[in-house]
Amino acid sequence: FFILLTTLNICANAEILFTENSVGDRIPISSPVENYNPNSNQYINPFIEDKIQLEINITNYENYLAYLTEGQIKMFQSYPETFVMNIYPSRRSCAVPQEVMDLTKSGNSKMIANGEGVDGIVGSIPFPNATEPLHHVWNHILRYRGVDIIGGAPYYVVNPDGSMTQGAGEAIAKNCWNPFVKDSFCEGLQGMLMQKVTHPPRLADASLLVIESLNALESPRKAWVYDPGTRRVRRAPNIAYDYLGSASQGLSTADSFDGFNGAKDRYNWSNAGTELKFMPYNVYDFYNSDRKEILTNFHVNQKYMRYELIKVNIVRADVKNDKRHIYPHRVMYFDADSHGMVSEEAYNGKKEILNYRELPLMNFYDEPACLAVHSATYNFATRRYLLNNVRSSEIDKI
């Protein structure tokens, strides 16, 4: 009787604690918090006083299935002894500059070229009242990210035994869909990405340049690579779709960078509703942590992760009959406040989850901009994971 009563109480608490009202009101933080030092790589956690409301683990995750994604459920089942999710109060802190909000209110963007392009006011969130599935994808791609992102580009492939391959590089990302960019180079472009490998030594100086247009049908992606072995630059039209880069060791595709990017023509897209889900959010403790502490077996150290109940727009992508992709089915989750992707499940041809991806969001309040602190790709077949696009207070360390 005691066991039954305890179970009933847990289920009741799930419904009482987590409802539509649990998400709360949006209170953006649009300026640096007290004692923030712009010369430091540290970001003060504005929610340091928050307490864990609930720890979800293998013993109780079934009580919260309504708020979990299929990928999260698979993580509990695959790593029952180590994977936990600490649930904190929802703090809807994401913000953008006032100029972006004003442009969004006055915008009249529209999709063109069968969804492969956007025509609208540069600097706005193109589709604040999104109705089409590709509206959410374009909002994610074109959301405000700051002007230029310059810094290190560390990545890690972690094996089940804890051993890892690590690398680093230098990266420059120019965001052309930005109200503060006044550059003739940006005419008709989404932006530009340049990367150079600095570690490991055998790949040092290998470089990549990608230029992305606002209309992939009219002006497809242009990419070049530099091979230090031959000292030659060559065009690289294959760096798109499901191209597997060597650095990811087969764990991630070209169009998975930043969640999703590039041409959309290989999929049929559909809306799958708006739901409340536990998602990685306001992960200041992770950002400020020691790199040695966060890289653990099977998945990142969940002690430093924070999950909140947020509203997400869910989009499905199913490969077209006459196309191919190693991920023939994908489910993407977009934060309703920031429009950024926070999670994705990539399925194989048997409708089994191949990869689960998390893109934990954090408000860089000095900008302000809500960006993913990293991309963590968990591969269930090999039990390895890829941690890349890492932003942290240790950005220059490998």
What are these regions (language model features)?
Residues 167-169, 207-211, 235-239, 357-359, ...:
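Short amphipathic beta-strand/extended segments with alternating polar/hydrophobic composition
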Residues 1-9:
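Bacterial N-terminal signal peptides
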Residues 188-190, 201-204, 216-218, 230-232, ...:
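Coil-to-beta-strand transition motifs
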Residues 11-14, 396-398:
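Short, intrinsically disordered, charge-balanced linker/junction segments flanking boundaries
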Residues 15-221, 227:
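Solvent-exposed N-terminal domain segments of exported/luminal and surface proteins
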Residues 207-283:
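Acidic, serine/threonine- and glycine-rich low-complexity intrinsically disordered segments
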Residues 320-397:
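C-terminal soluble interaction/assembly domains
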Residues 167-199, 255-332, 342, 348:
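Extended beta-strand-rich segments in extracellular/periplasmic secretory proteins, especially
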